[in-house]
């Protein structure tokens, strides 16, 4: 008997299979969190935010007016990335396209919320850019599994990566898009990993 090694999900060893989910997470996080926070802080710097707040318009509608355009822009970018992945890079969508879009929309919503949170604690555009870059962009690139495998990281970095939304999004996209698994298995895998992360944090 001669054993043979066969790669189940990427037999041709294409690098696009690995970096496409990571690029999706990075671009969506960049557009939603960083651009939203900078846009709102710009209004605070120029003084137009105070004018808007004293106007008859409700604060909720002011926030929605800032967030909805980036939500739409992120959806357009998501569609563009998927089209380029399938028709240019030959990365198939092996699983459910519907659930892939649903998971992506949830991630966009979370990223927008993070951008709004950053805009409330910063007063200048430079500060908003630094906070979103250092607190979101760099961890997303280095600790989300986009470049380096999470399993090879030290335990403390694995615990830190557990709080990054991009980690769970990239993991879900890889399972839905590359592995083609059912969404229930994705939820089970994410829940199990999240539970293990809590146990790791408790033992530190």
Predicted regions and their residues:
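Transmembrane helix segments
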Residues: 122-163, 167
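Short helix-capping/hinge motifs at transmembrane helix termini and TM-loop junctions
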Residues: 42, 88-93, 122-123, 147-152, ...
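Conserved small/polar residues in nucleotide/adenosyl-binding loops
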Residues: 193-200
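Helix-loop-helix units of permease transmembrane domains in multi-pass membrane transporters
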Residues: 38-71
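Short hydrophobic, aromatic-rich alpha-helical segments embedded in or entering the lipid bilayer
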Residues: 2-5, 149-191
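Transport-system extracytoplasmic interface segments
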Residues: 1-31, 35, 199
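Alpha-helical transmembrane segments and their short interhelical loops
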Residues: 59-133, 138-141, 184-190
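A hydrophobic alpha-helix feature that marks transmembrane segments and, especially
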Residues: 26-48, 116, 120
């Amino acid at each position: 008997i001669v054993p043979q090694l066969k790669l189940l999900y990427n037999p041709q060893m294409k690098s696009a299979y690995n970096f496409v989910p990571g690029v999706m997470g990075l671009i969506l996080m960049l557009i939603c969190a960083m651009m939203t926070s900078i846009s709102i802080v710009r209004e605070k710097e120029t003084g137009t935010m105070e004018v808007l707040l004293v106007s008859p318009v409700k604060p909720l509608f002011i926030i929605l007016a800032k967030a909805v355009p980036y939500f739409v822009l992120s959806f357009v970018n998501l569609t563009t990335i998927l089209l380029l992945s399938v028709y240019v890079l030959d990365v198939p969508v092996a699983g459910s396209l519907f659930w892939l879009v649903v998971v992506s929309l949830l991630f966009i919503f979370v990223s927008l919320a993070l951008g709004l949170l950053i805009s409330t604690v910063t007063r200048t555009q430079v500060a908003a850019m630094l906070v979103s870059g250092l607190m979101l962009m760099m961890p997303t690139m280095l600790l989300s599994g986009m470049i380096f495998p999470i399993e090879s990281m030290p335990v403390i970095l694995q615990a830190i990566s557990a709080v990054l939304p991009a980690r769970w999004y990239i993991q879900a996209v890889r399972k839905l898009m590359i592995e083609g698994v059912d969404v229930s298995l994705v939820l089970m895998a994410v829940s199990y990993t999240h539970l293990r992360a809590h146990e790791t944090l408790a033992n530190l």
